Amino acid sequence: MRNGIKLTEQEATLRQLLLDVSSYSVTLGGHHQKPELRFAGGWVRDKLLGLLSNDIDVAISSMTGSEFGSLMKQYVELPEARDKYENDILGRLAKIEANPEKSKHLETATLKVLGFDIDLVNLRKETYTDVSRNPSVEFGTPEEDALRRDSTINALFYNLQTSEVEDFTGRGFQDLQRKVIKTPLAPLQTFKDDPLRVLRSIRFASRLMYEIAPEDEMAMRDSTIKAALRLKITRERVRVEILKMLGWPKPHQSPSLLEASGPHRALSLIDRLDLYNEVFTDPTDADCKLVDTTKWHRAYNQLRDMVKSGSEGPIRSILLGSPEGPEALYHAWLLTCFVPWAREPLMFPQKSSKRPMTAASLAAREGIKAENKIYRLIDDAVSHLQDIIEKKNAISHEDQTTKLTIKRKQGASAVLHREMLGLAIRKWGANWRSSVMYALLTEVAETKTETDAQVVLDGYSSWLLHLSSLNLLDVDQLEPIVKGDTLMKAFNTKGGKWVSLALNCMIEWQLRNPDRTDAAGAIAEVVRRKEELNIPP
C-alpha cells in the first residue's frame, strides 16, 4: 500500500504543472525557498484504496494558496508554458479569504485544472486555547499539518517532489489497512477544537464501511462535545456533512447510496452515538425538547431492507423507481432523518411572527439549514402524513370488511372514488411519492413487531397497486383538457377568479371520465356548473 499510487496521465500532467509553477516562483525573487508541494488528504486515501477522485487538495509549504494560485495564472501565460501545456488549462480562480469564525480557518484558492477540482492551501499549524473558540493559525510543517487533521487516514501526503506517500502521524497506513477511523491526536481535544470532526468521522466510517476507534466513540458521547456540536458549528457546515452522508451532491454516482450501505451506516452511527438531538434539532431554541429516537432504527432499517431486497414490488418500483431515479432514494434517506419528528405538534419559530411550522420542518430549517427544495420536501411529507395514512387505510379497511377489491366498484361509486384519490394526490403535489414513503416509514417505526411491520408494508403495497390500476400515478401532472383562454372565448367573457375554478372543475371531470378526451364534454361540465362557478354573463 505504501508504494501503491500510480498517477494517471492527467494526474501526472497536473503534478508536472504544479512543480513547474513551484520552480517558476523562485525565478521571481520574491521567495527565497522553492515551495514544496504535496497532494493531501482524501485524494491520497482514495488512490491507495483504488478509488477515483477528482477533488485534490494541494498543500504548499511556504506561501498561501491564493499566492500560489496567482503564480499559476502568471505561469500559464508564459510562452514556454503555452508550448508545453494546453491553452486554457486553468479554470476560473476563486480566492476564499481566511475566516476564523466558528471553527473555519482555511485560506485557500480553488480552481479547475485538467478536469480536477483543486484546492490550494498552505501547510498550517493550529493552536487552540480555552480563552477563544477560534485557533491561531500560522504556517506549519508537514507533521503539524498532518496532526491537526480529522483522522489518520486523511492525514497522508503524496510528495510531488519525491513521488512518495508520507505518513507523518505514523498510523495512517496502519489504520487504512485495519479499516479504522482514528484521530491523529487525543480525540476529546480534537473534537473540542472542531466538533464538526465528529460528523466527518461518521461520514468516512459510513462511506468506507470502517469502524470508529473505541476511544473516539467515547469522546463523541462526551456531554461537552455534544454541546459544542450543537452550538459551536454553523449549521450550514452540519448540512454539508449530513447531505454528503446521504449521497449528495451526485446521488446517481453514489454506489453506497444505491446499495443503501452508506446512508444506513451513517444514520445508525448517529443513533448509536446518541447524537440525533445535536444534529436534527433547532439549536437556536435553548428550550427545544429532546425528541424520542428509540424507534427511529425501525425506519432506517426498513429503508435499507427495501433497497437491498432486490424485490421489484410496488413500493420499490413506484416510490423508489420514480422518474426522479436515484434522487428519489436520496430523498427517502433525507426524509428518514426526520421520522422521529413526525408526530410532534406544531412549533413556533424563535423570534418570528410567522405561522407555526411542523416540528420536522423547523428541525430541518434550523438544524441543517435545509435549502428550499429540501425544506418543502420535508414540510409536504409531514403536512400530508395523516391524510395519506387515512386514504390508504380507507381502502385497506374496505377490502378487509367487504372482501371485495376496489377495482370491482361499479358506476357512480367507482367514478367518485377515482376522483377523490386523484384530487388527494394532486393536493399532495409533485413530491407525493416521497410523502407516501415518509408515511410508510413513520408507520413502520411505530410498529412493535416484524409481523406488524409487514402488515403496514402489505397495506401500502395493495394501495399503490390500486392507484396504478386506476392510472393515477402521474395524476399530479394532469393538465386541464381546455386552456384558460379557450374557456374565456367559449364564454365570451373576461378572465377572473372563475377561470381557475373552472379549470379545477375540468380536472374533476377528467378524473371522473379518464377515457374521454373531447373538449366539448369538459366545457359542457363547466356550463352545467356555470352558476356555481360564478362565471359572469
Protein language model annotation of sequence segments:
Residues 1-537:
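Catalytic cores of the polymerase beta-like nucleotidyltransferase superfamily
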